[in-house]
Amino acid sequence: MPMNDTFRWIVVVFLATHIPATIMMDSQALVPAKFVPKFARSLLEFHVNANHDPLMEFQPVWFKSLIAFELVFQLPFFFVGCYAFYHKRNWIRLPGIVYGTHTATTLIPILADILHSGDIPSAAARAQLFFIYLPYLVIPAMIAVVLCANDQPFGAQGNAPAKRAKARRRGFLPVKTA
């Protein structure tokens, strides 16, 4: 069964918005401050103060290791994933499963830390921060589940390369027959 179009668009928007968030916010756990634009440092400071985020404030080593993986592997996937989900390409299935399972798995210790951190001043602040991070568990987990459940998540048309399929629709290439 092909992927629901609403979910496909949720994934495209999720991945597209994750690009600036990763570059401007998350990368600050590893990139020296002198290389980070002032507006991005201010944005992170605002987030830490408004949401009482001890992970971005104190940046423990285990958290930095997850950010390193995000920068090296997930950031490129965001671009590739946006393209593939937007253009309905079935070849994204395996990379999407890997991305979804890895990302969902990394959110377990992050959410556990938020739930048990002594650095968050109140239950309301803890809940607020928990719900800020929760979509980064739920959406990747849903991506993995949906892609695991479908050999061809975008149906048969998801197998054709974009340029060849477009040329074929316009009559420039012959249609293959069995």
Predicted regions and their residues:
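Interfacial helix-start motif at the membrane-water boundary
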Residues: 49-72
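Juxtamembrane "helix-exit" motif on the non-cytosolic side of transmembrane helices
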Residues: 110-120
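Non-transmembrane, juxtamembrane loop and terminal tail segments
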Residues: 156-178
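N-terminal signal-anchor transmembrane alpha helix
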Residues: 5-36
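Hydrophobic alpha-helical cores of multi-pass transmembrane domains in eukaryotic membrane proteins
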Residues: 12-24, 72-76, 97-109, 131-145
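Juxtamembrane helix-break-helix junctions at the cytosolic face
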Residues: 78-93
